[in-house]
């Protein structure tokens, strides 16, 4: 038995070494026939002695039992997206922004921007443990079994020196040859074809049956380290050197990665990759540029959803000429009225395009486009088709001007366009069918009226079954009507009716927030409530008065004026008040009672005696501004249980930190 165990280990190690030479070094070390012979021998031994199979055996890539659904995974560290630049001018502006914040001129690590899907792969003690999609950057889907089938993903890291916990981030993609093979097979079976390699990779990676994923010849390139534990683990000081380290540990890295010391060399790299784009074995849509020095990256930091130290320099999208046959006006869930060009179908960038966005009235005027024109279509970012130019010499004599509608094409409400904004919007947010679902979901949400049990799916069913058309209709619902919904028995329906009754007791700030007024978030709603004290005073205000409120500028003031000018909005508000929605009066607070006025506070961790929203509201009532992140301008951090990175940053910056007990004492609870 020991001899068999030794042979299994020898075959596993030998095959993994050949995989490394093939997928990472791009230098096959044996003929395919010899590789196949070794693989068959290992499969025979493992079939006879399954208990001896090793976790990193290459036979484990064939796929396992099909899943019923993907589980969600919360990333240990957010997977942020990248900002884009589309021209040399925009790149120069990015370079200047970066250079202005650093004492030394930065070098950039440059690499092709793969047109695939970002994934996170965790290794614990060098062994593949979990893989997840990027998702929304915070929460992704567990695709462990599917990624396990990708031959270029090491199931065990090579060598030594890797940390006990290592997150490898990279891109899963489908090489062009594999894409053609998949489509050839689908074509032979009369099945639907994938339109491009990215869609094929996405469809393959999100298969519930990993055997299908295994058959699709996906590939993986690592592009960054993610979480490393312990955090003190010694790592290379540059991004390029970290990629070299990943390659030494067995993770494939693009052979096109290069460090560029200055603007000319970055631009030359961009042009070189653009020129060779069609020659590469995989689809790309630009190049990624990252400040190479890790210390400089840390100095630059992040904005809300992207690092300041990196950008994607996108390639020009593919373009074609076709005829604009008409324009439809679509109303989005936030009320944005968008002109959409109806086109004579044309094949652009791998897909047939029959519609393209015209964005807004300003863009129509800038283009000078008319119905009947021949137009140039571009797939912006290789995804969203748009009209980018008119071919004036082809304009027909019967071309017609495009008229922007003064009323919403869905509900007939006025269409407004606030000065300084490009987007025109329907003002019927509370009654417009196009916005109805989002308006009522917002109204019922936790930070608004907080209607327990009124989730998104319940709202969608209520509207689809025409039980509710506006927020006021929610309070007319009966338990018997609610039982018409899927999976809603009498007990659940009664609970929801009781929750609706309880939600009638709210606060003025929550009520204002629940109305979904454009640009009026939770903090602005609280400021409005504290300033005006009553709904009647607020409804009578003009733009000048609104602008006296903290955080209310010209645009928000105009949104408020337009909202309260619309009769249908006032009708919905009256309906809510008649249904019994109410709130306690807001008492005048003396200036000296605003003990925290001018201070910025941050909450982190779990509060056990006070929920987060109540704590925030009480701090705001004392004049504090409650922010979402810690900075040098933070006056105090409230650290609840399991406080994380915010606490660490506060301690590093010397920000005052208190616990929940101290907060309760300050609030007088």
From Swiss-Prot:
Catalysis performed (reactions) = NAD(+) + (deoxyribonucleotide)n-3'-hydroxyl + 5'-phospho-(deoxyribonucleotide)m = (deoxyribonucleotide)n+m + AMP + beta-nicotinamide D-nucleotide
EC number(s) reported in the record: 6.5.1.2
Amino acids binding Zn(2+): 408, 411, 426, 432
- What GO terms are given for molecular function? DNA ligase (NAD+) activity; metal ion binding
An example GO biological process term is: DNA repair
**All copies of domain BRCT, residue ranges:** 591-669
Annotated positions binding NAD(+)? 32-36, 81-82, 111, 134, 171, 290, 314
Biological role: DNA ligase that catalyzes the formation of phosphodiester linkages between 5'-phosphoryl and 3'-hydroxyl groups in double-stranded DNA using NAD as a coenzyme and as the energy source for the reaction. It is essential for DNA replication and repair of damaged DNA.
Protein name listed in UniProt: DNA ligase
> What is the organism of origin for this protein?
Shewanella loihica (strain ATCC BAA-1088 / PV-4)
